[in-house]
Amino acid sequence: MRILVFLSTVVLAWFLTGAVASAGPVLEGDTDDPVSPAPAVSRPDSPHCSVTLAERFPSNAADGSPQTFSGTLTPPESCPGPWAKVVLDETVTVSGRQYDRIGDLLIGGTEVWWGTTAEPSGEGRRAITYHFDKDLTPYTALLRTPQPFTGGIGNYTSDVYTGVYAQTVTLTYYRADHAHPAPATADRVVGFRHADAAPGAATVHFTAKDLPRNIIRARLEVTLEGGACDEQWFDDVPDEVAARYPAANLCGHGPFREAAVALDGAPAGGVPTFPHIYSGGIVPTLWRPVVAIDTFSLHAETLDLTPFAGRLVDGGPHDLAFTVPDIGGSWSVVATLLLDTDHHAARTSGALTQDDAAPVAAKRTKVKDIAGGVNATVTAHRDDVTAGYVDTSAGRVRTRVERTRDYRNSDDVTVAGLTQHVVQSDAGWQSSVSTVDGKARSAVRHDWSYPLAVDASAANYVDDQNFRLTGAVDMTMRLSDLSGDGRSWWPVSASREWLGTSGVLARENGVTSESDGSSRTTYAGTDDRGRPYWHAITTDHGLVTAESGGSRRR
């Protein structure tokens, strides 16, 4: 349901008038600060130092124009490496009326954080403050030397949208010691500024150059964020359905999305994305105070490119291409290469021996009539295999990567296109097995599942002064990591984060008549140390009404 088409006008009108107290349906006032059930990044009990990149830095200058913070990040003298962990912390405060916005942090040309904001309620009586953190230890190689940085929230203000985001950003370096050893991390981090794909230009390219000549392992970390008609890509409909209901302004091209990756023109696999929903999405009251899963720091996927390592060590530039088939809006692509090198040889060599990765996923679409409308069902599948070898100081290392994805989206479109019921399943796994002389050297597997159900209705929409928008979302992120011997697997970590939420926003004759939401959310599994962790939160009318488990609210 392209509810956002209505909301661009609706929310503006709602904010201009504000909520008016009355008997009957609930009108939310000030809401609690945004919260999440997910565990915070763990912190070693070792000496540490913090570096401040921004201190209550406003997203906008005095004249209202967007601005970014910048400088040079230098490792603190009192906490030289090696480090057990490096953690990014960001605290954001905003009040007034504002849309959800996108933020990022570039260090040495690498996007180390990409996320979105909480949208303030618009009441203007109390600011909201939220905090998030991210483990930057995987980028340790980048952080060892002084690097330029720039970042911030891209925000735009007006006489109506007055909210300015105040940002405090720090990096904390935890020194390694006997009790907290430095973990193994990539020897080289090769990042790129993000690039945007769009209809008519569905492929973006990054050039990787000056790579090490002794690579033994290569991983590609990818974050994808949809915009415009693909902001809620999971409720995009096939073109024939959009054409059937032109007045509903439905977005077409169907709901399946991926970034098909190619290295120097050779297919390397497909990258999915979690169905992120931003804090103004569908109905804004859905996300107060519990925001959608991973709103503040978008989840990245990792594609193992080790079978291609023999090609990457030739000393020349290499093209990384990302294509978004059936693109209906814009897609921001954030890519980072994490490279391991041979510590006992200046040069390695190798070859790609098998490339059975499909250029695009196999997809099927079926549309049928149902009572009051149509059902559109889209399925897609990937079953990719790549393999190669690298000649190293430890011998010839052969690596086989298998990657699967099974996708299904069923969308009941009724009431002339103004109501949608979406049920989506999206799951897959990647395994990487490396052997020397037939014996397993390493074997890892990552499983993921992102089920989603969305009900959205603008059936009672008359105009921007008379409407009732309703929405309900049930979303889950299931992740698990396993290790093995090439034949059997055993669990290392697992988690399940779930959120069920419902919301409503209504106006009658230009006056807000209903503004309410409620939600339940849980996190169950392990934290980043592998320890059991459970946290549950219940909310109603924009306020936390119950909370159990966990170590702290954030």
Describe each region flagged by the PLM:
Residues 14, 90, 209:
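Functionally constrained cores in energy, signaling, and assembly domains
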Residues 1-23:
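Secretory targeting and sorting signals
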Residues 150-218, 340, 344-393:
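Flexible, low-complexity coil/linker segments
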Residues 211-233:
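Short, compositionally biased leader-like segments
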Residues 200-205, 228-235:
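A short secondary-structure junction signal
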Residues 78-87, 211-219:
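Extended extracellular/luminal ectodomain segments enriched in beta-structured repeat modules
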Residues 24-58, 62-79, 83, 91-185, ...:
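Beta-strand-rich ligand-recognition modules
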